[in-house]
Amino acid sequence: MAKILKFDEDARRALERGVNKLADTVKVTIGPKANVVIDKKFGPPTITNDGVTIAREVEVEDPYENLGAQLVKEVATKTNDIAGDGTTTATVLAQALVREGLKNVAAGASPALLKKGIDAAVAAVSEDLLATARPIDEKSDIAAVAALSAQDQQVGELIAEAMDKVGKDGVITVEESNTFGLELDFTEGMAFDKGYRLRLLRTDQERMEAVLDDPYILINQGKISSIADLLPLLEKVIQANASKPLLIIAEDLEGEALSTLVVNQIRGTFNAVAVKAPGFGDRRKAMLQDMAVLTGATVISEEVGLKLDQVGLEVLGTARRITVTKDDTTIVDGPGKRDEVQARIAQIKAEIENTDSDWDREKLQERLAKLAGGVCVIKVGAATEVELKERKHRLEDAISATRAAVEEGIVSGGGSALVHAVKVLEGNLGKTGDEATGVAVVRRAAVEPLRWIAENPGLEGYVITSKVADLDKGQGFNAATGEYGDLVKAGVIDPVKVTRSALENPASIASLLLTTETLVVEKKEEEEPAAGGHSHLGHSH
C-alpha cells in the first residue's frame, strides 16, 4: 500500500494538533470542579472524569494528527499502568511540554539538546518529590487519599477499612451488586475457587458447606483413585486423633478412594473433605506450593520422590479453620513459618517484576495477595447502569491511588507539589544554551495541572499558580473550598508515585515528538463508487 510522508516542522505541527485535540478533551475533567465528558457508544453512555477512559475513546480523523493523539493516549495508559491514577494530569503535562518544546524548536533550538535538558529537569523534580514525600500508614491518611481520588468520603473510609484488614499487598476487588450503596466483604486467610467434590461430604447441610476446625491438610499433586495409596495415611490420621478432620487437596479424587471417604463419612468413622486443586499445569504446582508454605504441609509429588502410600503425618499441614462451599475453599490462619511465607512472597514479587505477560502478572498478583493477606470485596450498587459504571471506575481509581500512596508516600495535592518541586530548577541546573532551555520548558509546563484545576471552575489560572509558587511547600490552593492553606492538613493529598509518573511519562513522549523529523502514514484507498442503479441492463434492439 502506498505511503504518504510529512517532514520537519509540518510533521511536528501535525502531531501537536493531534496532541491538542485529545488533551483539550481530557483536561476539562481535572480537579474537584471537573466537568464530566459523556462518551456515547453502543448501549448507555459512560459518564466519567477518568483521563485514560476518555483518551482510549478518542480517534482523530486526520491520520497525522491521530499519531499525535495516539502518543498522548500512550502517556495516559502508561501512567495508569504504573500508578493507576493521575492520567488527566499526565495528559495536561504532555500537552504543555509539547507546546513549549515545539515553540523553541521553531525558534531554532536543537531538539536533541532540548531533550537532554528536559530529561535532566524531570529527574531532578522527581528526586525532589520523593524527598518531600511523607510516608503514610495512618488509617486516616489512607482514607483521605482514597476519598480525594473518588471524591467521596464514604468510599475513602471503606477503602481504608479494607486496606486495614488485608494489608498493603492484599487483594481489594470491586464487584457490581444488585443492592444500592456500598458494602465490604472480607475473607481472612487464603481462598481458592474450588469446592467440595461431593455434596455428601458437607458437614452443615443447612448452610451447604463443610466447616473443618483445626484439620489436617493433605496436599497431593496428582490424582488419587486407588484406596491402597490413601489407606496407610488415613490409618495414621485415625490413630493419631480420630476426631481431627482431614482436608484432601488433589488434582482429583475419584473411584474407590472417593467412595471410601463417603462411606466413612456416613458411618462417622472420620470426617474428611476432598477438593480439586485450583489452576492448571505449572500454575497449579505453584499454587499448591503456596498452600503448603501457608499451612506447613509438604506437597506430595513423585517429582520430588514422595509417594502417597509411603508418607506419614509429617507431610500434613494444619489451619485454625477451613470452610468449603460448593464453589470455593477458604483456609483461615495456617501456621506456616513467617520467614518461609515472606521468602515465598518475595519470590512471587520478583516474578511479577520480570514477566512481560499481563495475564501472568494478574495471576501472580492473585497468588501474592492470597499469601500476603486476605481478600476484600467492595460491592457497589447504583440506581442505573450508567451510575454504576461511573462509581465502579472511581472506586478502582481510588484503590490504585491508595496503593501508590502506601508504596511511596504522599505530597500535597491539587497540582501544588509540582509547582513547589520545580523550584529546584531555578538555576537551570547549571545547564547552558539549548539544554538550559529544555530545563525551562519543564519549569513552565509544571504549573499547567494547577492552572487547569483553577480554570475549570472559571478562575484565573496563572494568578493562582503564581500565588501558590510564593507559598511554602505543602501549602497550595484548595479548589473545592477556594482557599489557600496547608493542603496536607486539609486532606488534599496525592500519592507521590502518581505525581512522578504523571511527569515522567509525558516528558518521555514529548522528547520523542520534538526529535521527530518524518511522519509516514498509509494512503487511504479511494473507495470505488458503487455502480449506478440500472447500468448493467443493456438495450437490446
UniProtKB/Swiss-Prot annotation:
Compartments reported by the entry: Cytoplasm
Subcellular location, principal: cytoplasm
Keywords: ATP-binding, Chaperone, Cytoplasm, Isomerase, Nucleotide-binding
Keyword ATP-binding in record: yes
Reactions catalysed, as given in the entry: ATP + H2O + a folded polypeptide = ADP + phosphate + an unfolded polypeptide
GO molecular function per UniProt: ATP binding; ATP-dependent protein folding chaperone; isomerase activity; unfolded protein binding
Enzyme Commission number, as recorded: 5.6.1.7
Function as written in the Swiss-Prot or TrEMBL entry: Together with its co-chaperonin GroES, plays an essential role in assisting protein folding. The GroEL-GroES system forms a nano-cage that allows encapsulation of the non-native substrate proteins and provides a physical environment optimized to promote and accelerate protein folding.
Subunit structure, as described in the record: Forms a cylinder of 14 subunits composed of two heptameric rings stacked back-to-back. Interacts with the co-chaperonin GroES.
Family to which this protein belongs: Belongs to the chaperonin (HSP60) family.
Protein name: Chaperonin GroEL 1
Organism (species): Streptomyces lividans
This protein's encoding gene: groEL1
